[in-house]
Amino acid sequence: MREGYYSDKYFVRAREILVKDRHRPCVTMQVFGKAHAFLGGIDEAIAILKLCSQTWEELQVWALYDGDEIAPWETVLLIEGPYDAFAVLETLYLGVLARRTRVGTNTRRVVEAAQPKQVMFFPARHDHWLVQTGDGYAAHIAGAIGVSTDAQASWWGSEGIGTVPHALIAAYRGDTVLASRKFAELMSESIRLMTLVDFENDCVGTSLKVARALGERLYGVRIDTAETLVDTSVIPLMGTFKPTGVNPRLVCNVREALDREGFQHVKIVVSGGFTVEKIRQFEEQGVPVDAYGVGSSLFQGRFDFTADVVRVEGKPCGKVGRAYRSNPRLERVD
């Protein structure tokens, strides 16, 4: 990183020119975004500056905090010092700010839509594995109660959570009860047992079978019906609502069936195509969901950041349209 391997080439060449010319102007670099968002990646950006700048001791840095709500054009990071000391790092700190702010903002929005219900962060399979650690931390700061991989949970010393998956059920020849029994038998009791119940497209029937077999050991069931299917319990009720996928009527059917047989303790988790809008619809209708598993929608959108030199040797020197903007919320980084 310090040598510029991951940096846009023109930053590498800019530093090379300054070093060869022995020209070390003290600049003020101002970083901002253009959207209302919840900030992420600041801790990483600071770590990059501390570990990869040529001389951290020559820099003065001010920043907001991960999780802070930010306005368009608000300065989130301010760097002062010899430009050659950190010139090649711009690509890197802007990249982590953009990535983690996107994940954190999307997660915060679904968390707010779901309140007081819980949100589980489940998009690991939708992107490269190398982004998991920081993404998980951004989601954690944004309010997700759990993540699906140990890597995502590593920055705060936790571990991934999950359910009995479709693949394990298939490995036991489609027997959801048997797969769940094996989970209960072979996994620690400290691990909450949550089972996917849509393998046979009969969420009510499967939920009841699993609940009867496992009793208090069953923490919850997860409904993940595909958008192209109509669950068996919904077919007789069709006509006045969208019947496909995970819909309010299906969730109510499962909740009512479990309650009738005394399984009020069993939680219901829903997943599959959930967005801010769909969660809001569920909450407005009072759908008896206990938690939402949200995946690919948490990687959508653009939350880009821009860095500009706005002062040189303490005097205004930015390109047209860019000027120093003070932000009293910034705090000095030690």
Question: Can you annotate each of these PLM segments?
Answer:
Residues 1-84, 92:
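Flexible, solvent-exposed loop/hinge segments and secondary-structure transition points
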Residues 1-13, 21-23, 34, 38-40, ...:
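Gly/Ser/Thr/Ala-enriched C-terminal appendages of enzymes
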Residues 25-27, 217, 305:
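A generic structural signal for well-ordered coil/turn residues at beta-strand boundaries
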Residues 30-31, 127, 299:
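Alpha-helical scaffold domains
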Residues 35, 68-70, 77-261, 276-277:
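Buried, small/hydrophobic-residue-enriched core segments of structured protein domains
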Residues 58, 116-119, 190, 265, ...:
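A generic structural signal for alpha->beta connector loops
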Residues 64, 198, 269-271:
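Structural motif
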